[in-house]
């Protein structure tokens, strides 16, 4: 009995996460104020860059004459959804078969599994899209592995570790790919992924182009992958990630789609355009939302066991929050049309409500491949996109 107790004690010590140093509350409040100011400055700089790119497109269209195609600003918004990100990866591949192909997106944003997809969507060529499709089609047996029989102990940093995902992401998003992302700095395009800073208690949207350049300069390209893994780090289930002085987890906690919902009145792209160009028409603004989920889940009998209840309720809470964010975006678009006389389209593509996974569980290859197939089929059909709020 004593031997068993000693072994258990050793196991507990071995599983414990290293304790992080405490900080005074006043210091944390000051750090949050500084972080808020930094995020606000980044947001203004981002809007300025997109505005400049929009002006360039409008000028090019004016020079081309009346027969030229009207200019557009295309924003791709990729939601979270765990292993259902296979659907979004498939959508991007199928979209490439549409006449004219995928747009070159001016802005790509991603959250959680959408953050893993976003860099490949931003690069946009067929080879990059195929890389992310294979990331989901061939997950591997060790994509997520339990920490063992004592995974639930409170000193553990998470229930699971992600050796397979970390390895696959390192292969797919290698240094040459990161160099291509960094090379986009200065052309007005944007690549943003959302995380949650659990220390400061707020979202943190990362400019992945700037981060790619910083990572290359410091010879630490793994920094980019840490940001993506943080965005996909379901709290307690998957490992959190320390970046700089702070701890980051799943971006879906503070926003499962990243669409500018916190932009203050008068500071958005449409408002800035109208203030600077009172009489000039603004290029069409198109939001493309890939929702790696369903608007309504299939009904089921949920057993009175805490894992079943918590799992179902957590997924429903995230889904409902995301749908409310989408409704907010549709409302923002309507207000901008009325107030600033600009054209804004919002289009959404989601897993059909009637679709049922062929097998239970997460990271099941049969499920992920069926979702990828479904995404390819729907992505290749322009009629799959809906233009009304969910």
Language model segments and positions:
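Sec-dependent signal peptide recognition
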Residues: 1-7
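Catalytic nucleophile serine of serine hydrolases
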Residues: 82, 111-112
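C-terminal motif of bacterial Sec signal peptides marking the signal peptidase cleavage site
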Residues: 11-14
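Hydrolases whose catalytic domains are alpha/beta-hydrolase-1, hotdog thioesterase
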Residues: 117-120
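Patatin-like phospholipase
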Residues: 16-106, 122-390
């Amino acid at each position: 009995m004593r031997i068993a107790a000693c072994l258990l004690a050793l196991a507990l010590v071995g599983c414990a996460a290293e304790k992080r140093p405490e900080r005074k509350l006043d210091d944390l409040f000051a750090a949050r104020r500084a972080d808020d100011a930094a995020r606000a400055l980044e947001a203004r700089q981002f809007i300025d860059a997109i505005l400049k790119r929009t002006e360039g497109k409008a000028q090019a269209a004016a020079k081309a004459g009346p027969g030229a195609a009207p200019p557009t600003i295309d924003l791709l918004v990729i939601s979270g959804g765990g292993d259902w990100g296979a659907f979004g990866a498939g959508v991007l591949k199928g979209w490439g078969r549409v006449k004219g192909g995928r747009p070159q997106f001016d802005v790509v944003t991603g959250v959680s599994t959408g953050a893993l997809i976003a860099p490949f969507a931003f690069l946009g060529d067929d080879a990059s899209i195929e890389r992310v499709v294979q990331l989901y089609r061939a997950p591997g047996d060790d994509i997520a592995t339990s920490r063992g029989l004592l995974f639930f102990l409170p000193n553990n940093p998470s229930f699971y570790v992600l050796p397979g995902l970390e390895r696959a992401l390192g292969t797919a998003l290698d240094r040459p790919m990161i160099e291509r992302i960094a090379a986009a700095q200065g052309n007005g395009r944007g690549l943003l992924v959302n995380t949650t800073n659990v220390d400061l208690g707020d979202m943190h949207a990362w400019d992945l182009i700037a981060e790619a350049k910083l990572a290359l300069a410091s010879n630490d390209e793994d920094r980019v992958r840490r940001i993506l893994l943080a965005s996909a780090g379901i709290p307690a289930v998957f490992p959190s990630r320390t970046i700089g002085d702070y701890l980051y987890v799943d971006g879906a906690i503070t926003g499962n789609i990243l669409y500018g919902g916190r932009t203050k009145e008068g500071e958005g792209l449409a408002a800035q355009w109208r203030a600077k160009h009172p009489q000039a028409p603004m290029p069409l603004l198109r939001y493309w939302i890939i929702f790696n989920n369903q608007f309504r889940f299939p009904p089921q009998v949920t057993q009175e066991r805490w894992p079943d209840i918590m799992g179902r309720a957590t997924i429903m809470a995230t889904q409902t929050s995301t749908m409310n964010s989408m409704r907010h975006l549709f409302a923002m678009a309507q207000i901008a049309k009325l107030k600033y006389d600009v054209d804004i389209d919002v289009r959404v593509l989601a897993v059909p409500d009637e679709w049922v996974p062929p097998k239970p569980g997460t990271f099941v290859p049969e499920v992920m491949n069926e979702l990828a197939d479904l995404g390819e089929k729907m992505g290749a059909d322009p009629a799959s996109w809906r233009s009304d709020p969910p």
